[in-house]
Design a protein with these regions (language model features):
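Phosphate/pyrophosphate-binding loop motifs in nucleotide- or prenyl diphosphate-using proteins
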Residues: 2-203
Length: 203
């Protein structure tokens, strides 16, 4: 138990999930290992990792801190949408949120040297954590895709998560560049990035 703002004890546990079921928004009960629960559970894991990254940022990274906190807010929106069966509520994640993320990606892409091959995850401690976040995003995205083949979900949640992994990749590279940490390139692969292609060529 803990005290709320009025000095009243609030019980944190409900015991309603002791038999392996949980309730979605709207009241439907599903197993805790259902794809829907796995999807928004991974979203929670990602949000916690981002919170840790925020706590480790240096003063010079204050603008990044603000961005990451906004992403944490957006991830709660994503989790809410994933916990809402189709027709049981209004979705929160929008096309505009995806577009805002794309603008951030473009901005960070200009803050690191051009590369043609993959880079090994690592470098500055903050960049390493951002790469970790990128891989958790990918796992969350896989869960969402699995769910989308079973049930109707907000399409923009999947799109947002796809862009978010690109965001963390771009930011990790920008952080390494800012702190003058040289990236290690993957030496056994071919050209995977094509700078000659313009953004409009991909649309």
């Amino acid at each position: 138990m803990q005290l709320n703002g009025r000095g009243i004890f609030v019980q944190l546990y409900t015991k309603t999930g002791d038999k392996g079921y949980t309730s979605l928004i709207g009241g439907e009960k599903v197993r805790k290992d259902a794809n829907r629960v796995d999807a928004y559970g991974t979203m929670d894991e990602l949000n916690s990792l981002i919170g840790y990254i925020v706590s480790q940022l240096e003063e010079r990274d204050s603008s990044l801190k603000g961005e990451l906190i906004e992403i944490q807010q957006n991830l709660f929106d994503c989790g809410t949408d994933l916990a809402t069966p189709h027709g049981k509520g209004t979705y929160k994640v929008t096309k505009e949120m995806v577009q805002n993320l794309e603008m951030s990606i473009d901005g960070y892409a200009d803050k690191a040297p051009e590369i043609l091959s993959f880079v090994l995850p690592g470098g500055h401690p903050t960049a390493s954590l951002l790469h970790m976040a990128r891989t958790v995003v990918r796992r969350a995205e896989r869960s969402i895709v699995s769910l989308s083949f079973e049930e109707t979900v907000n399409q923009y949640v999947a799109v947002y998560m796809n862009r978010l992994s690109d965001y963390f990749f771009a930011v990790a590279r920008a952080v390494n560049n800012r702190y003058n940490v040289k990236e290690i390139l993957y030496e056994r692969g071919g050209k995977v990035f094509h700078p000659e292609l313009k953004k409009e060529d991909l649309n």
